């Protein structure tokens, strides 16, 4: 395997279907067309890190720098996923390292990531990478009715 980490805002089309598959593996059914549309809507400062072996996508991380009144020094890993059959092979570590480099180059002092409470293998992975659990926040969500388009 010749793993490369690509940093991009607009990944090549050959990876769109594979991104949809990775997101679907995590319990969020997604189609290629959804990915193509969502990529065009991402904030301009967002970046994707793609772990690739040639034209095969093995994992990705979605990164965000948000400028707000409270957390100006923080960048966020919005999502990080490694293809199931390639987990525990160092790809996640390479993605996290690349995310930290990007955050530092973006002038940030912290990198935040969130993970579902049921994803205990991910918790162990992030702890092993030196991340500390921050239990000071609770996330609330409400589904909103959208007008028909």
Regions found by a protein language model. Give the residues of each.
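Conserved acetyl-CoA-binding loop-helix of GNAT-fold acetyltransferases
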Residues: 79-82, 88-101, 124, 128
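Conserved GNAT acetyl-CoA-binding A-motif
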Residues: 96, 103-115
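Residue-level recognition of the GNAT/N-acetyltransferase active site
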Residues: 66, 83, 87, 116
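Conserved beta-strand-loop-alpha-helix junction that forms the acyl-donor binding cleft
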Residues: 113-122, 141
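Short hydrophobic/aromatic beta-strand or adjacent loop that forms the aromatic wall/cage
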Residues: 46, 135-139
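Short beta-strand-to-coil "C-cap" segments at the C-terminal boundary of structured domains/repeats
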Residues: 141-147
């Amino acid at each position: 395997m010749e793993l490369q980490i690509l940093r991009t805002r607009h990944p090549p089309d050959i990876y769109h279907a594979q991104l949809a598959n990775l997101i679907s593996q995590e319990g969020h059914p997604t189609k290629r067309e959804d990915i193509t549309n969502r990529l065009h809507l991402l904030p301009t400062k967002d970046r994707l890190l793609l772990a690739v072996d040639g034209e095969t996508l093995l994992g990705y991380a979605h990164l965000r720098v948000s400028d707000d009144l409270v957390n100006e020094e923080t960048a966020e890993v919005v999502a990080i996923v490694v293809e199931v059959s390639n987990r525990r092979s160092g790809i996640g570590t390479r993605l996290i390292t690349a995310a930290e480099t990007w955050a530092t180059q973006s002038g940030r002092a912290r990198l935040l990531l969130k993970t579902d409470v049921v994803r205990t293998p991910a918790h162990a992975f992030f702890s092993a990478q030196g991340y500390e659990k921050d239990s000071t926040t609770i996330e609330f969500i409400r589904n909103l009715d959208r007008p028909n388009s």
